[in-house]
UniProtKB/Swiss-Prot annotation:
<keyword id="KW-0819">tRNA processing</keyword>
<keyword id="KW-0413">Isomerase</keyword>
<dbReference type="Pfam" id="PF01416">
    <property type="entry name" value="PseudoU_synth_1"/>
</dbReference>
<dbReference type="InterPro" id="IPR001406">
    <property type="entry name" value="PsdUridine_synth_TruA"/>
</dbReference>
<dbReference type="GO" id="GO:0160147">
    <property type="term" value="F:tRNA pseudouridine(38-40) synthase activity"/>
</dbReference>
<feature type="binding site">
    <location>
        <position position="109"/>
    </location>
    <ligand>
        <name>substrate</name>
    </ligand>
</feature>
<comment type="subunit">
    <text>Homodimer.</text>
</comment>
<dbReference type="InterPro" id="IPR020103">
    <property type="entry name" value="PsdUridine_synth_cat_dom_sf"/>
</dbReference>
<dbReference type="InterPro" id="IPR020095">
    <property type="entry name" value="PsdUridine_synth_TruA_C"/>
</dbReference>
<dbReference type="InterPro" id="IPR020097">
    <property type="entry name" value="PsdUridine_synth_TruA_a/b_dom"/>
</dbReference>
<dbReference type="GO" id="GO:0031119">
    <property type="term" value="P:tRNA pseudouridine synthesis"/>
</dbReference>
<protein>
    <recommendedName>
        <fullName>tRNA pseudouridine synthase A</fullName>
        <ecNumber>5.4.99.12</ecNumber>
    </recommendedName>
</protein>
<dbReference type="GO" id="GO:0003723">
    <property type="term" value="F:RNA binding"/>
</dbReference>
<feature type="active site" description="Nucleophile">
    <location>
        <position position="51"/>
    </location>
</feature>
<dbReference type="InterPro" id="IPR020094">
    <property type="entry name" value="TruA/RsuA/RluB/E/F_N"/>
</dbReference>
<comment type="similarity">
    <text>Belongs to the tRNA pseudouridine synthase TruA family.</text>
</comment>
<comment type="function">
    <text>Formation of pseudouridine at positions 38, 39 and 40 in the anticodon stem and loop of transfer RNAs.</text>
</comment>
């Protein structure tokens, strides 16, 4: 049978999602816990391979197993064998043609900036601290130039392995909740470091170092060297993955927990 799981994790102490030799990853910890429940080796496939330090509230994985277990066992049993910073949120049986990555139609990320002169001791790895005052309205206005299908070479990591820089951004919103600025972006898919590179350049606009139209110009140049530095991994969350309704994938609160859902 094939099982899909919803996964939440604090990526602060992991070297990203993907299993690697000699370092700890989220995938490694999850597979170890699932293998205990299944009493057999389990390999998982995820919707999005997040980088070192990046978090997830809406990650989706699937795996195949011959072990017959109640769905609640894949949740409670796995959680009992996971470290405190990784948790299974739900489990469903899915059809054989479901794939956590290839069946996805969109992914959604939130980047959380703590915009205050002094840093906070609470959630130091859960938000990105930026001490200069930022104009979130200008950041939002600039972000609208990125909507639609475009070549995102200006916001693509140099070592990106994707065959094409073209992506379709469905939604980009920048809002302020007290001292928190939230950059909320959804697209069909993302090139490597795309969200963090976009945020880095939006911060330049928010600080007043660049005009709103600079983002439009950057997009047209298709040159990563002209854009701002990559924003820190802290503060980035994979919050949702969209699938066709026929797969029956549950919808849950986006998070992270300290933000109101939308």
């Amino acid at each position: 049978m094939k099982i899909a799981l919803g996964i939440e994790y604090d990526g602060s102490r992991y070297f990203g999602w993907q299993r690697q030799d000699e370092v700890e990853s989220v995938q490694q910890k999850l597979e170890e816990a699932l293998s205990i429940v299944a009493n057999a080796p389990i390999e998982v496939f995820c919707a999005g391979r997040t980088d070192s330090g990046v978090h997830g509230t809406g990650q989706v994985v699937h795996f195949e197993t011959q072990a017959i277990r109640p769905l609640q066992s894949w949740c409670f049993g796995t959680n009992a064998n996971l470290p405190d910073d990784i948790a299974v949120k739900w489990a469903v049986e899915v059809s054989e043609d479901f794939h956590a990555r290839f069946s996805a139609t969109a992914r959604r990320y939130r980047y959380i900036i703590f915009n205050n002169k002094l840093r906070s001791a609470i959630l130091p790895k859960g938000v990105s601290h930026y001490h200069y005052e930022l104009d979130h309205q200008k950041m939002h206005e600039a972000g609208q130039f990125l909507l639609g299908e475009n070549d995102f070479s200006s916001f693509r990591a140099a070592k990106c392995q994707s065959h094409t820089p073209w992506r379709n951004v469905h939604y980009l919103n920048v809002s302020r909740l007290g001292n928190y600025i939230v950059v909320d972006i959804q697209a069909n898919a993302f090139v490597h470091h795309m969200v963090r590179n976009i945020v880095g350049s939006l911060i330049e606009v928010g600080q007043g170092r660049q005009p709103v139209e600079w983002i439009q110009w950057l997009l047209a140049q298709r040159d990563r060297t002209l854009a701002a530095p990559t924003a820190k991994a802290e503060g980035l969350y994979l919050v949702d993955v969209h699938y066709p309704e026929r797969f029956g994938i549950p919808k849950t609160a986006l998070g992270p927990l300290f933000l109101a859902d939308s």
